[in-house]
């Protein structure tokens, strides 16, 4: 069994924001399998899907981004899932909009949801998919209001192209592992 976690903030006012791109990827998977989310045994919503003989739990923490680790640990304990079987999907202000980057492990890189998961798990040895949200003309100093802002119409078009790729990469991770997914979905920056 694999656990694929999309990071975001639970209130409807955050829907469509750059910070909720992890939720967007997970929602895309849930919709494509026509499996709705239900409340879990912790502060999370989940949907269970099967793909190529692999059970996959899709998870949306309902704890807010900065406390995501609590929901992740609760789900890992409930489903008895090990670190090597999780993939965390989040936004990344350091990557250009419309790109993705898979890694087997690594630092939080300024992403507070990842930071809290690392704190709760005690190390950074879990797979993650970072989805780029940075605009070319966006100064990195004003990141807080930017990440919590809604996508512009142009950004929405870009996201509509990358979200299915992210969903496919999450399925690839689930069936074939992080190295395979990295080899197929990590592309050099243009």
From Swiss-Prot:
InterPro entries: Pept_tRNA_hydro, Pept_tRNA_hydro_CS, Pept_tRNA_hydro_sf. Its EC number is 3.1.1.29. Keywords: Cytoplasm, Hydrolase, RNA-binding, tRNA-binding. The record marks 9 as: Discriminates between blocked and unblocked aminoacyl-tRNA. GO terms for molecular function: peptidyl-tRNA hydrolase activity; tRNA binding. Coiled coil: none annotated. GO terms for biological process: protein quality control for misfolded or incompletely synthesized proteins; rescue of stalled ribosome. One of its GO terms (cellular component) is cytoplasm. PROSITE patterns: PEPT_TRNA_HYDROL_1 (PS01195). Belongs to the PTH family. Monomer. Hydrolyzes ribosome-free peptidyl-tRNAs (with 1 or more amino acids incorporated), which drop off the ribosome during protein synthesis, or as a result of ribosome stalling. Catalyzes the release of premature peptidyl moieties from peptidyl-tRNA molecules trapped in stalled 50S ribosomal subunits, and thus maintains levels of free tRNAs and 50S ribosomes. This is Peptidyl-tRNA hydrolase. It comes from Chlorobium limicola (strain DSM 245 / NBRC 103803 / 6330). The lineage of its organism: Bacteria, Pseudomonadati, Chlorobiota, Chlorobiia, Chlorobiales.
């Amino acid at each position: 069994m694999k656990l694929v976690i999309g990071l975001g903030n639970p209130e409807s006012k955050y829907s469509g924001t750059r910070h909720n791109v992890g939720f967007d990827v997970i929602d895309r998977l849930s919709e494509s399998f026509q499996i709705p989310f239900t409340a879990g045994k912790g502060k999370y919503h989940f949907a269970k899907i099967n793909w190529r003989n692999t059970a996959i739990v899709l998870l949306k923490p309902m704890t807010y981004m900065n406390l995501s680790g609590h929901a992740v640990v609760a789900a890992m304990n409930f489903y008895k899932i090990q670190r090597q079987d999780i993939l965390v999907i989040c936004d990344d202000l350091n990557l250009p909009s419309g790109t993705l980057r898979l890694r087997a492990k690594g630092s939080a890189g300024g992403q507070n949801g990842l930071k809290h998961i690392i704190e709760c798990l005690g190390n950074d040895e879990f797979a993650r998919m970072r989805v780029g949200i940075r605009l070319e003309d966006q100064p990195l100093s004003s990141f807080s209001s930017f990440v919590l802002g809604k996508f512009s119409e142009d950004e929405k078009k870009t996201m509509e192209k990358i979200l299915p790729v992210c969903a496919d990469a999450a399925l690839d991770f689930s069936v074939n592992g992080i190295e395979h997914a990295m080899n197929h979905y990590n592309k050099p920056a243009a």
